């Protein structure tokens, strides 16, 4: 697709139980998402509002959503939508925090990208109008209930869409694996210097 920088991962933020980023936007819309959206800050549960407190998006997202520019109509701003507010408050007594979803679009030949965490595949589903199935994974850390979905786009099979649901409550395991040889070496050197 011309005019789209495919080198940067694209980001979609959604929140809620039944929000599925694959069903809400078609493939053309997903490919046209602004690659320059900036994500920064802590990803934490929001206690009092529907908007996740830890998300900070650049002013480009506001222009993108607000209708300014040629792509303004692709993502609707649901903050003033009464249905969104009803769904947000629905079940508030039952469940205090909504699962947060983050979707990354990446060009890759591999379906599963190494993100530093360990995952266990627990399912696979064929997707309507797509020759590539969607795979479902869970984080293997015993107290973490983060899930991810991995799927290729129907119109561009080189693009892998990885959707994370939830927030990890533990450090990145690959980081610890990388640091452990260094820590062992430091312990060995400290023992040698004590002699």
UniProtKB/Swiss-Prot annotation:
Pfam family, one: WRKY
Cell compartment(s), UniProt: Nucleus
Ranges of biased composition (kind: Polar residues): 1-10
Predominant place of localization: nucleus
Keywords, ordered alphabetically: DNA-binding, Nucleus, Transcription, Transcription regulation
Alphabetized GO MF terms: DNA-binding transcription factor activity; sequence-specific DNA binding
SUPFAM superfamilies listed in its UniProt record: WRKY DNA-binding domain (SSF118290)
Region (Disordered): 1-20, 70-93
Residue ranges the UniProt entry marks as DNA-binding: 108-173
GO CC field: nucleus
Family annotation (PROSITE patterns): WRKY
Family: Belongs to the WRKY group II-c family.
PANTHER family, sorted: WRKY TRANSCRIPTION FACTOR 56-RELATED, WRKY TRANSCRIPTION FACTOR PROTEIN 1-RELATED
Summary of the function given for this chain in its UniProt record: Transcription factor. Interacts specifically with the W box (5'-(T)TGAC[CT]-3'), a frequently occurring elicitor-responsive cis-acting element.
Descriptive protein name: Probable WRKY transcription factor 56
Organism: Arabidopsis thaliana (Mouse-ear cress)
Lineage, broadest ranks: Eukaryota, Viridiplantae, Streptophyta, Embryophyta, Tracheophyta
Gene name of the encoded protein: WRKY56
